[in-house]
Swiss-Prot record:
Pathway: Plant hormone degradation; abscisic acid degradation. The keyword Iron applies. InterPro entries: Cyt_P450, Cyt_P450_CS, Cyt_P450_E_grp-I, Cyt_P450_sf. Its EC number is 1.14.14.137. Induction: Not induced by ethylene treatment or flooding. Gene3D superfamilies: Cytochrome P450. One of its GO terms (cellular component) is membrane. PANTHER family: ABSCISIC ACID 8'-HYDROXYLASE 4 (PTHR24286:SF376), CYTOCHROME P450 26 (PTHR24286). This is Abscisic acid 8'-hydroxylase 3. The gene is CYP707A7.
Amino acid sequence: MAASFVIVIVISFFISLAFMCYVHYTSRQRRKLHGYGHEKAVRLPPGSMGWPYIGETLQLYSQDPNVFFASKQKRYGEIFKTHILGCPCVMLASPEAARFVLVTQAHLFKPTYPRSKERMIGPSALFFHQGDYHLRLRKLVQGPLGPDALRALVPDVEAAVRSTLASWDGNVSSTFHAMKRLSFDVGIVTIFGGRLDERRKAELRQNYAIVEKGYNSFPNSFPGTLYYKAIQARRRLHGVLSDIMRERRARGEPGSDLLGCLMQSRAGDDGALLTDEQVADNIIGVLFAAQDTTASVLTWIVKYLHDHPKLLEAVRAEQAAIRAANDGGRLPLTWAQTRSMALTHKVILESLRMASIISFTFREAVADVEYKGFLIPKGWKVMPLFRNIHHNPDYFQDPQKFDPSRFKVSPRPNTFMPFGNGVHACPGNELAKLEMLVLIHHLVTGYRWEIVGSSDEVEYSPFPVPKHGLLAKLWRDDSVSVETDGCQNGDNDDNGVAMV
């Protein structure tokens, strides 16, 4: 009896001790989350954390995400907290804050993605890392994406543009899908040069499309789900890439394209060659980064030009002069000519600002960080809101107006970041701009198009594009290339469809 009593006392003691430890731990966490007890008595930014577990995720996805963030900024200011996608977050909507996170104190904020995304792309992909590995790999990737490489790539980009427009000619198609095809083809030629046969290209295209469909699906590995199919397709992609690398080694010709540079690079740990897995992860990462973002911007450019006929005619005149200098389009575009498209370049910059395809980026605080008297706790997600900055009237007058002339003067520092900022800014931004310039040249000098249905609604897949990908009919019209004077302000057919 006495022994039983002692056992009960001992068990009760340990239960009480465990409960006290739990209470102490949760109390500390509570104080930390609410900013109490911190050495400098800083507090969390204002904001709302929403419901337990789900936070404000439902509010985010029940409306336009940009409206959600804009309303939060209007209520709480340029730094505020929320809880979305299962994570406590601090949102930053000022140029100074974005620079703080992405440039001056970038070492305190690491790139962060869900594990399911890393598994889909590959854990060794450039944009999942920071530090020495990231810097070595970024320097390597910038070579095949630099000015010298792009100068040699102009004919290939032009061929891809011509092919895309020719396949669209006379048909009603989703602009976004057409632009995705273009961006994929440009990505393939950048990665593999002109050395990839059609069978391999078809294998890559087919399996990448499956990976893309499953990328934003719920990470359920049960057979038959989109995620499961995507993981299987990702393995097949790795197999195709491994075969290509093996064939190149057998020939003793790794090549000077992006794949060849990765195969020969000693960007691995301790100066070692990259493994085939590391090379494959980065190739798939480049394909992913190069396609949907660029295709989304190209889709918006087609819409913005359509919606502003006087601007379209001015762009058409600029491009017609270049076409005339190329013997009516019989000679290819040159790198120098793409550098001379002043108005067209401003249209691209304004499209990047207006659409703000990359609305924000994710980082994670690796330590408790203080910014302007507020605490950003270790482990919290930090999101610089690019779109909020791009649409702030303090930095861009009348921000909802599409006005390329605003770029006659350079924007204030850190107010225009369509490709990010700092060491993690997109290394392929100049390739993307080249693709846009060449597409616009051939689109406005050789074709007319009409938008089918409404183009005012926006959908996210995952980047913002007009609903249904902007359905449009395109047809060849060589007469437009000689209209260097005057303005056609657009016509309306009997069905009220604007034609340009």
